Amino acid sequence: VRQTDIAGNTSAATSFSFTLDTSAAAPGVALTTDSGSSTVDHITNVGTLNLTSVETGATVEYSIDGGHTWNTSFSATEGVNDVQVRQTDIAGNTSSATSFSFTLDTSAAAPGVALATDSGSSASDHVTNVGTLNLAGVETGATVEYSIDGGHTWNTSFSAVE
């Protein structure tokens, strides 16, 4: 930039450079670990997120209430987590939000076990001539394993022995 005054004198040039930044891209969001039997079902026992396309120096914000409030940190809770993520770059541009949903499941309840038939002289003495078990509380998709040696070895099938 330079100027010429009304007397016809031209100043030395002043250099000035700047970067015009008018937008911020929405960040990519994925689970850090999608654990369990499927690596793409968004069910995990680790509730941390992996963000991509975050600009250097940008502030990342999370919303768990549909975008009404935003925070700079996020902690997953047991069960379904619906989170939105956005970034505000160093120029002050705020991206659109990326929505991501996943289920955090950090524990499996012990299943209930009972004899299918307690045929002994008492219906509650666990003496039977039918070695079939009934299970309760097994989660859909869970793998059931049996141990007959105090938990040293486990198998997915069970056959009662006399």
Indicate where each model-derived feature is located:
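Low-complexity, disordered linker/stalk regions enriched in Pro/Thr/Ser/Gly
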Residues: 1-162
